[in-house]
Amino acid sequence: LEKSWNKETYAYFMEMGTGKTKVLIDNMAMLYDKGKIDGALIIAPKGVIKTWYEQEIPTHLPNHIENVTVLWQPNITKKQQEKLESLFEIETALHILVMNVEAFSTEKGIKFATKFLNSHKVLMAIDESTTIKTPTAKRTKNIIDLSEYAKYRRIMTGSPVTKNPLDLYTQCYFLDPYLLDHASYYSFRNRYAVMKSMHVRGRTIQVVHAFQNLSELSDKLQDFSYRVLKEDCLDLPPKNWIKRHITLSKEQQKVYDEMKKTALATLNGKVTSTMTVITQLMRLQQITCGHFVADDGTTQEIK
Protein backbone atom coordinates (compact mmCIF):
# COMPACT_ATOMS: atom_id res chain seq x y z
CA LEU A 1 0.00 0.00 0.00
CA GLU A 2 2.86 2.37 0.81
CA LYS A 3 4.37 1.73 -2.61
CA SER A 4 1.18 2.12 -4.60
CA TRP A 5 -1.37 4.37 -2.95
CA ASN A 6 -0.57 7.60 -4.81
CA LYS A 7 0.57 6.11 -8.12
CA GLU A 8 -1.70 6.50 -11.12
CA THR A 9 -1.10 2.91 -12.22
CA TYR A 10 -0.23 -0.21 -10.22
CA ALA A 11 -0.54 -3.99 -10.31
CA TYR A 12 -1.26 -6.17 -7.27
CA PHE A 13 0.05 -9.61 -8.24
CA MET A 14 -0.90 -11.20 -4.92
CA GLU A 15 -2.01 -14.78 -4.47
CA MET A 16 -5.42 -15.64 -3.03
CA GLY A 17 -5.56 -15.12 0.71
CA THR A 18 -2.74 -12.56 0.88
CA GLY A 19 -5.02 -9.51 1.17
CA LYS A 20 -5.05 -7.84 -2.25
CA THR A 21 -8.74 -6.91 -1.96
CA LYS A 22 -8.20 -5.10 1.34
CA VAL A 23 -5.12 -3.36 -0.07
CA LEU A 24 -7.16 -2.04 -2.99
CA ILE A 25 -10.03 -0.84 -0.78
CA ASP A 26 -7.54 0.85 1.56
CA ASN A 27 -6.00 2.49 -1.50
CA MET A 28 -9.43 3.76 -2.54
CA ALA A 29 -10.00 5.15 0.95
CA MET A 30 -6.66 6.97 1.06
CA LEU A 31 -7.19 8.58 -2.33
CA TYR A 32 -10.71 9.62 -1.36
CA ASP A 33 -9.54 11.12 1.95
CA LYS A 34 -6.87 13.09 0.07
CA GLY A 35 -9.49 14.43 -2.34
CA LYS A 36 -7.94 12.62 -5.30
CA ILE A 37 -11.00 10.52 -6.23
CA ASP A 38 -14.73 10.53 -5.62
CA GLY A 39 -15.55 7.38 -7.58
CA ALA A 40 -14.40 3.78 -7.99
CA LEU A 41 -15.26 1.35 -10.78
CA ILE A 42 -14.62 -2.26 -9.74
CA ILE A 43 -14.62 -4.79 -12.60
CA ALA A 44 -14.69 -8.42 -11.53
CA PRO A 45 -15.69 -11.87 -12.80
CA LYS A 46 -19.40 -12.60 -12.54
CA GLY A 47 -18.83 -15.16 -9.79
CA VAL A 48 -17.35 -12.66 -7.32
CA ILE A 49 -19.11 -9.34 -7.93
CA LYS A 50 -21.67 -10.07 -5.20
CA THR A 51 -18.83 -10.84 -2.80
CA TRP A 52 -17.39 -7.41 -3.52
CA TYR A 53 -20.77 -5.76 -3.02
CA GLU A 54 -22.04 -7.71 0.00
CA GLN A 55 -18.83 -8.55 1.89
CA GLU A 56 -15.56 -6.95 0.83
CA ILE A 57 -16.59 -3.29 0.55
CA PRO A 58 -18.83 -3.25 3.68
CA THR A 59 -16.11 -5.04 5.68
CA HIS A 60 -12.99 -3.14 4.63
CA LEU A 61 -14.12 0.38 3.68
CA PRO A 62 -13.53 2.66 6.72
CA ASN A 63 -16.70 3.67 8.56
CA HIS A 64 -16.00 7.39 8.26
CA ILE A 65 -16.32 7.29 4.47
CA GLU A 66 -19.81 8.08 3.25
CA ASN A 67 -20.38 5.93 0.21
CA VAL A 68 -22.96 5.05 -2.42
CA THR A 69 -22.28 1.53 -3.69
CA VAL A 70 -24.26 -0.04 -6.53
CA LEU A 71 -24.04 -3.49 -8.09
CA TRP A 72 -24.56 -3.51 -11.86
CA GLN A 73 -27.49 -5.57 -13.13
CA PRO A 74 -28.05 -6.16 -16.87
CA ASN A 75 -31.84 -6.12 -16.47
CA ILE A 76 -32.58 -2.57 -15.39
CA THR A 77 -35.88 -2.37 -13.51
CA LYS A 78 -37.31 0.86 -12.14
CA LYS A 79 -35.78 0.10 -8.73
CA GLN A 80 -32.40 -0.69 -10.29
CA GLN A 81 -32.53 2.52 -12.34
CA GLU A 82 -33.05 4.50 -9.12
CA LYS A 83 -29.98 2.83 -7.61
CA LEU A 84 -27.88 3.63 -10.66
CA GLU A 85 -29.01 7.26 -10.63
CA SER A 86 -27.95 7.52 -6.97
CA LEU A 87 -24.36 7.27 -8.19
CA PHE A 88 -24.70 10.80 -9.52
CA GLU A 89 -26.13 12.30 -6.32
CA ILE A 90 -24.56 13.27 -2.95
CA GLU A 91 -21.50 15.12 -4.20
CA THR A 92 -19.44 14.48 -1.05
CA ALA A 93 -19.79 10.67 -1.09
CA LEU A 94 -17.48 8.05 -2.55
CA HIS A 95 -19.43 6.55 -5.45
CA ILE A 96 -18.63 2.87 -6.07
CA LEU A 97 -19.88 0.93 -9.08
CA VAL A 98 -19.28 -2.84 -9.16
CA MET A 99 -19.61 -4.40 -12.62
CA ASN A 100 -19.00 -7.86 -14.02
CA VAL A 101 -16.40 -8.04 -16.77
CA GLU A 102 -18.94 -9.54 -19.20
CA ALA A 103 -20.92 -6.27 -19.10
CA PHE A 104 -18.18 -4.68 -21.19
CA SER A 105 -19.19 -6.81 -24.13
CA THR A 106 -22.59 -5.09 -24.14
CA GLU A 107 -23.59 -1.65 -25.38
CA LYS A 108 -25.64 -1.03 -22.24
CA GLY A 109 -22.74 -1.77 -19.90
CA ILE A 110 -20.24 0.31 -21.88
CA LYS A 111 -22.61 3.27 -22.09
CA PHE A 112 -23.23 3.38 -18.34
CA ALA A 113 -19.58 2.84 -17.44
CA THR A 114 -18.66 5.73 -19.75
CA LYS A 115 -21.21 7.99 -18.05
CA PHE A 116 -19.86 7.04 -14.63
CA LEU A 117 -16.24 7.65 -15.62
CA ASN A 118 -17.08 11.03 -17.14
CA SER A 119 -18.99 12.12 -14.03
CA HIS A 120 -16.37 11.41 -11.36
CA LYS A 121 -12.67 11.31 -10.59
CA VAL A 122 -12.40 7.53 -10.74
CA LEU A 123 -10.10 4.74 -9.66
CA MET A 124 -10.74 1.90 -12.12
CA ALA A 125 -9.73 -1.57 -10.92
CA ILE A 126 -9.89 -5.01 -12.51
CA ASP A 127 -10.10 -7.98 -10.18
CA GLU A 128 -8.67 -11.14 -11.79
CA SER A 129 -7.16 -9.10 -14.58
CA THR A 130 -6.34 -12.21 -16.61
CA THR A 131 -9.93 -11.84 -17.85
CA ILE A 132 -8.58 -9.19 -20.24
CA LYS A 133 -5.46 -11.08 -21.34
CA THR A 134 -6.76 -11.73 -24.88
CA PRO A 135 -5.96 -8.70 -27.08
CA THR A 136 -8.61 -9.50 -29.68
CA ALA A 137 -11.49 -9.98 -27.21
CA LYS A 138 -14.29 -7.43 -27.45
CA ARG A 139 -14.41 -6.78 -23.70
CA THR A 140 -10.62 -6.33 -23.57
CA LYS A 141 -10.73 -3.67 -26.28
CA ASN A 142 -13.68 -1.87 -24.66
CA ILE A 143 -12.15 -1.84 -21.18
CA ILE A 144 -8.84 -0.52 -22.52
CA ASP A 145 -10.68 2.22 -24.45
CA LEU A 146 -12.49 3.26 -21.26
CA SER A 147 -9.34 3.23 -19.14
CA GLU A 148 -8.22 6.61 -20.49
CA TYR A 149 -11.12 8.23 -18.62
CA ALA A 150 -9.93 6.90 -15.24
CA LYS A 151 -7.63 9.00 -13.09
CA TYR A 152 -6.15 5.94 -11.38
CA ARG A 153 -5.93 2.36 -12.64
CA ARG A 154 -5.27 -0.90 -10.79
CA ILE A 155 -5.12 -4.58 -11.76
CA MET A 156 -5.32 -7.49 -9.34
CA THR A 157 -4.63 -11.17 -9.78
CA GLY A 158 -2.83 -13.99 -8.03
CA SER A 159 -1.65 -15.49 -11.31
CA PRO A 160 -0.81 -12.79 -13.87
CA VAL A 161 0.50 -15.47 -16.23
CA THR A 162 -2.04 -18.25 -16.90
CA LYS A 163 -0.49 -19.84 -20.00
CA ASN A 164 2.55 -17.84 -21.02
CA PRO A 165 4.23 -14.46 -20.38
CA LEU A 166 2.38 -12.94 -23.33
CA ASP A 167 -0.71 -12.89 -21.07
CA LEU A 168 0.81 -9.84 -19.38
CA TYR A 169 0.58 -7.51 -22.36
CA THR A 170 -3.03 -6.31 -22.31
CA GLN A 171 -3.18 -6.39 -18.51
CA CYS A 172 -0.31 -3.90 -18.40
CA TYR A 173 -1.56 -1.99 -21.46
CA PHE A 174 -4.76 -1.27 -19.51
CA LEU A 175 -2.64 0.45 -16.87
CA ASP A 176 -0.53 2.41 -19.35
CA PRO A 177 0.33 1.64 -23.00
CA TYR A 178 3.97 2.58 -22.38
CA LEU A 179 4.77 0.59 -19.24
CA LEU A 180 6.28 -2.29 -21.20
CA ASP A 181 7.74 -0.08 -23.96
CA HIS A 182 5.71 -1.75 -26.70
CA ALA A 183 2.89 -0.01 -28.54
CA SER A 184 1.55 -3.23 -30.05
CA TYR A 185 1.02 -6.82 -28.96
CA TYR A 186 3.02 -8.10 -31.92
CA SER A 187 6.15 -6.08 -31.10
CA PHE A 188 5.84 -7.30 -27.50
CA ARG A 189 5.48 -10.88 -28.72
CA ASN A 190 8.51 -10.56 -30.99
CA ARG A 191 10.60 -9.33 -28.08
CA TYR A 192 9.67 -12.02 -25.58
CA ALA A 193 8.66 -15.03 -27.69
CA VAL A 194 10.30 -17.09 -30.40
CA MET A 195 7.75 -17.95 -33.06
CA LYS A 196 7.68 -20.80 -35.54
CA SER A 197 5.47 -21.59 -38.53
CA MET A 198 3.06 -24.51 -38.55
CA HIS A 199 0.97 -25.83 -41.41
CA VAL A 200 -2.60 -26.62 -40.38
CA ARG A 201 -5.25 -27.68 -42.90
CA GLY A 202 -3.53 -25.97 -45.78
CA ARG A 203 -2.82 -22.77 -43.84
CA THR A 204 0.39 -21.48 -42.30
CA ILE A 205 0.07 -20.10 -38.77
CA GLN A 206 2.54 -18.67 -36.27
CA VAL A 207 2.80 -20.36 -32.86
CA VAL A 208 5.01 -19.77 -29.84
CA HIS A 209 8.05 -22.04 -29.85
CA ALA A 210 9.90 -20.64 -26.81
CA PHE A 211 10.32 -17.52 -24.69
CA GLN A 212 13.23 -15.12 -24.40
CA ASN A 213 14.37 -12.01 -22.46
CA LEU A 214 12.17 -12.95 -19.49
CA SER A 215 14.56 -11.47 -16.92
CA GLU A 216 14.22 -8.14 -18.72
CA LEU A 217 10.43 -8.43 -18.60
CA SER A 218 10.55 -9.26 -14.90
CA ASP A 219 12.65 -6.17 -14.21
CA LYS A 220 10.12 -3.96 -16.02
CA LEU A 221 7.24 -5.38 -13.98
CA GLN A 222 8.94 -4.53 -10.70
CA ASP A 223 8.61 -0.81 -11.39
CA PHE A 224 4.81 -0.85 -11.18
CA SER A 225 3.78 -4.07 -9.44
CA TYR A 226 3.98 -5.94 -6.16
CA ARG A 227 4.19 -9.74 -6.04
CA VAL A 228 3.13 -11.72 -2.96
CA LEU A 229 3.07 -15.51 -2.65
CA LYS A 230 1.27 -17.41 0.09
CA GLU A 231 4.50 -19.08 1.14
CA ASP A 232 6.06 -15.66 1.76
CA CYS A 233 3.51 -14.42 4.27
CA LEU A 234 1.25 -17.24 5.49
CA ASP A 235 2.33 -19.97 7.88
CA LEU A 236 0.42 -22.80 6.24
CA PRO A 237 1.18 -26.52 6.52
CA PRO A 238 1.83 -28.40 3.27
CA LYS A 239 -1.20 -29.94 1.57
CA ASN A 240 -1.86 -33.51 2.63
CA TRP A 241 -3.50 -35.47 -0.18
CA ILE A 242 -5.50 -38.54 0.85
CA LYS A 243 -6.74 -41.12 -1.65
CA ARG A 244 -9.99 -42.83 -0.75
CA HIS A 245 -11.13 -45.89 -2.70
CA ILE A 246 -14.92 -46.30 -2.72
CA THR A 247 -16.83 -49.25 -4.16
CA LEU A 248 -19.78 -48.29 -6.33
CA SER A 249 -23.11 -50.06 -6.02
CA LYS A 250 -24.12 -52.33 -8.92
CA GLU A 251 -26.53 -49.70 -10.23
CA GLN A 252 -23.92 -46.94 -9.91
CA GLN A 253 -21.32 -49.07 -11.71
CA LYS A 254 -23.74 -49.83 -14.55
CA VAL A 255 -24.68 -46.17 -15.09
CA TYR A 256 -21.04 -45.08 -14.65
CA ASP A 257 -19.80 -47.52 -17.30
CA GLU A 258 -22.53 -46.41 -19.73
CA MET A 259 -21.60 -42.78 -19.30
CA LYS A 260 -17.88 -43.47 -19.57
CA LYS A 261 -18.18 -45.51 -22.77
CA THR A 262 -20.91 -43.71 -24.69
CA ALA A 263 -21.33 -40.31 -22.96
CA LEU A 264 -24.98 -41.32 -22.45
CA ALA A 265 -26.74 -43.14 -19.62
CA THR A 266 -30.32 -44.15 -18.77
CA LEU A 267 -32.02 -44.67 -15.39
CA ASN A 268 -35.73 -44.94 -14.60
CA GLY A 269 -36.50 -44.03 -18.19
CA LYS A 270 -34.58 -40.76 -17.85
CA VAL A 271 -31.67 -40.01 -20.16
CA THR A 272 -28.58 -37.93 -19.43
CA SER A 273 -26.21 -37.13 -22.26
CA THR A 274 -23.11 -34.99 -22.75
CA MET A 275 -21.67 -33.08 -25.67
CA THR A 276 -18.27 -32.18 -24.21
CA VAL A 277 -15.59 -33.97 -22.22
CA ILE A 278 -15.87 -31.54 -19.29
CA THR A 279 -19.62 -32.21 -18.99
CA GLN A 280 -18.99 -35.94 -19.19
CA LEU A 281 -16.51 -35.71 -16.30
CA MET A 282 -19.07 -33.74 -14.28
CA ARG A 283 -21.74 -36.38 -14.92
CA LEU A 284 -19.32 -39.16 -13.88
CA GLN A 285 -18.66 -37.29 -10.64
CA GLN A 286 -22.40 -36.91 -10.04
CA ILE A 287 -22.89 -40.65 -10.54
CA THR A 288 -20.20 -41.48 -7.97
CA CYS A 289 -22.07 -39.18 -5.56
CA GLY A 290 -25.27 -41.19 -6.02
CA HIS A 291 -27.28 -39.13 -8.52
CA PHE A 292 -27.28 -37.52 -11.94
CA VAL A 293 -29.15 -34.66 -13.58
CA ALA A 294 -31.20 -35.86 -16.56
CA ASP A 295 -31.54 -33.91 -19.79
CA ASP A 296 -35.02 -32.76 -18.74
CA GLY A 297 -33.58 -31.16 -15.59
CA THR A 298 -34.78 -33.75 -13.07
CA THR A 299 -32.40 -35.30 -10.56
CA GLN A 300 -32.30 -39.10 -10.51
CA GLU A 301 -31.05 -40.89 -7.41
CA ILE A 302 -28.89 -43.98 -7.90
CA LYS A 303 -29.11 -46.71 -5.30
Where are these regions (language model features)?
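Conserved Helicase C-terminal RecA-like lobe
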Residues: 5-9, 18-19, 23-45, 104, ...
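Substrate-gripping "pore-loop 1 plus following alpha2 helix"
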Residues: 111, 117, 131-146, 302
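Walker B catalytic acidic pair
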Residues: 127-128
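Hydrophobic positions in the central parallel beta-sheet of the AAA+
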Residues: 12, 97-99, 124, 153-154
